[in-house]
Amino acid sequence: MELPGSGYFQTLALFSVTFGGFAVLVAVFRQMIGGRLSDFDMFFIRSTLLRSFMAAGCSMLPSLLALFEISPSIIWRVSSLITGLLLILFTLTWYAERRAASGTPYTKAFRVNFLLQMLTAIFLLAIASGTILEPVPGYFAAAVTMIMVTAVIAYMAQLRLLLQAQTTGKRK
């Protein structure tokens, strides 16, 4: 059965993987210029790849569930539940790992990103429960898109920190 929004989810999955690959290339180029990768560089690469692959996998999840010929309502609830739980797990570990990797205070952009991710996770869990919102493709698509929006925001903020460290010579 063809789910509504399948083309969008396939495009989002492709974009997510492409974004992850591009982000890693920037870190590799930085390594070529500056030598050994720092703890923050490794955090940067890992978190970008994890978020990109999480968005890609969650984008493909409804199509996978549709192969089992279950009802669309269940597909959107299960997809929302799994994506919401993964996002909470990622966000909480990302918060702790960033502190360990950089040893610097959280920036305003980081805090905003953290809040957006947690709100997105809560939105997904609300979809999964079906009590506040009816589980439909549009809500799920908006939430997974927000995961990629927060990925871009985080990438730009982390890239700025990497470039500042490169110009000041302060690499952890």
Predicted regions and their residues:
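Small-residue-rich transmembrane alpha-helices that serve as helix-helix interface/gating elements
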Residues: 81-84, 138-153
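Hydrophobic alpha-helical transmembrane segments in multi-pass integral membrane proteins
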Residues: 56-64, 117-134
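N-terminal signal-anchor/start-transfer transmembrane helix
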Residues: 13-33
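Hydrophobic alpha-helical membrane segments
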Residues: 85-89, 108-129
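Membrane-water interface at the C-terminal end of transmembrane alpha helices
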Residues: 91-95, 124-131, 149-165
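Helix-coil boundary and interhelical linker segments in multi-pass alpha-helical membrane proteins
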Residues: 1-9, 63-76, 129-140
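Juxtamembrane helix-loop boundaries in multi-pass membrane proteins
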Residues: 10-14, 37-57, 103-120, 170-172
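Generic alpha-helical transmembrane segments
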Residues: 16-20, 50-58, 76-94
